[in-house]
């Protein structure tokens, strides 16, 4: 008996929950919650599957399972941090399920959601439910990032999906930071200017809360640099 069946036997309806995009520099974090009645062949950790197989399994899961998807925006990531934004996306995924699970299996550790459950480290390799959720979250997010490429063709979001690849970092250096970048993340904050941040705000591309938060981070960063430079040269701080 697999791990999913053990929990189903004890709790009844069990959902697997996973996310995609937690470590990216751009775009949202996407979570999926999946309830499977019957096992689907080939489900595994989404990162170990080819893009073509992920797409095929995504369609099969969407057709045969109860699926909920939740998104936390770059703004929510900046304002609440990536851990809390990930929990927000996961809870939204659970809210969007058409059935109400009594227990959840969550990939990761230390994550408490609105439904009782347990966390499994590398859960997408141990649980078919979490594996299915990982596939749904990744394919949904990959498609979303491909749409961002159409909006911002100077960025290869259809390829690197917003991860901190060498190509993506070079694109930021060349073209500048976008509103969909996670401005609280290094190295995005390092490459963001005060003028560009204010331009985003004045054009209505970011909220006042986000503007003030990132402005404070930029000012704090300048203060740290100032202190380091003075200390390195044995100069008084004030």
UniProtKB/Swiss-Prot annotation:
EC top class named in words: hydrolase
Any one of the GO CC terms: ribonuclease H2 complex
GO process terms (BP): DNA replication, removal of RNA primer; mismatch repair
EC number: 3.1.26.4
Pfam families: RNase_HII (PF01351)
Entry protein name: Ribonuclease HII
Keywords, comma-separated and alphabetical: Cytoplasm, Endonuclease, Hydrolase, Manganese, Metal-binding, Nuclease
